[in-house]
């Protein structure tokens, strides 16, 4: 039997919160949408673009309620949770539209409510539905989601898995200073705050090195060691894994038991409250991933992304909500895994990025033995920063993308100032993603993956109408994501 992730008291509080949400939903129908992502995948940009396109009548041909003209009004409203910071939509959209800079990434949880007035497509529903749906968007770091599996692991299991992973591939080099310090530590010695702090600092430095752009690894729990916030320096964040001898365990008052106690405190103080107060109350979820960056960084980054997706999908229980499950044990009934930055590819490769991500998800689902019902995959660009063109070279027409590289970007030895546009050949993904995974599985040292040019482009310049009103933010397949995530709730 798998270990329980929550206590009976936690379950009771979750059931009470779901009951309160259900009662509120009878008067004001609501869907709680979780938005998270792995390794700079663009959560803030996704939310900002989604809200901007709904508020400003964006081009959403695949979002049926808007395409059919059934949505009559869209507005922002006060969020229901006063203790949760508000997602600062106005600041983020100003950065995108006016300043043409990408907004800061998510470092803590935030929330935003957007409400749609609509006419139901069903005559029966028009009689009984209030014709209003509130979408509570809950934005949280992907590192927090990757912490949830820790609830089912004791300190020994966490230590064994983390230490074993640290000695594989590129992690072996990145973890060398931390592992050297760990091996030199006497776990039987008395608890020592300075030793604990040194180990925790070295462990956090290793996790940060794994996350850096040049590595782009995704499996990085405990996440709050990367984003400590107001818990920085607390005992609950001052711990690290330690190797335990096969026989016996250190006695009371030892460094080992000190670290074990702090690991359990991390779960109680950090992980459980997030699960109980936020995650367990979600109805729908989108997980954004930067699959292009992983491919660009090589086989280990792709394998690590698959490992992270396995851990992520194991957290969900996709399926249909019955009345009883809604009241007592809320179930996330739809999960979308979306590969971002589709605008970095020519449209001919969009379906290939989709297929690559779908294969990653299928492999993750197979590894954990869960059904794929309620899970969808797509490639998208929350904000389209490029346009497509063709150039002639040696008598052949080549598909290219055109955009404004960010200041400091270097392409083929040329450094850009953030003002000048350029055309680049983005590279190709394989038609059959299986060929890519076969190359990775071969285990051959130095195996080459598709060469994809990942360039950081500035957000696009938005044209204005004759009345001086800026058009909505351009995107790729954002409307399709909306349709999957909450289109059915507007039927």
Can you annotate each of these PLM segments?
Residues 49-55, 150-155, 302, 351-357, ...:
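Short secondary-structure boundary/capping segments
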Residues 338-345, 378-390:
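Short, conserved secondary-structure transition motifs
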Residues 16-22, 26-27, 53-331, 346, ...:
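Switch- and interface-adjacent substructures of P-loop NTPase systems
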Residues 344-369:
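GTPase G-domain guanine-specificity segment
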Residues 33-51:
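Glycine-rich phosphate-binding P-loop
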Residues 1-10, 293:
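Charged, amphipathic alpha-helical linker segments immediately N-terminal to NTP-binding catalytic cores
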Residues 34-36, 287-290, 338-341:
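Conserved beta-strand segments of the P-loop GTPase G domain that flank and frequently precede/overlap
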Residues 325-335, 371-373, 388:
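A glycine-rich, aromatic-flanked flexible loop/lid motif
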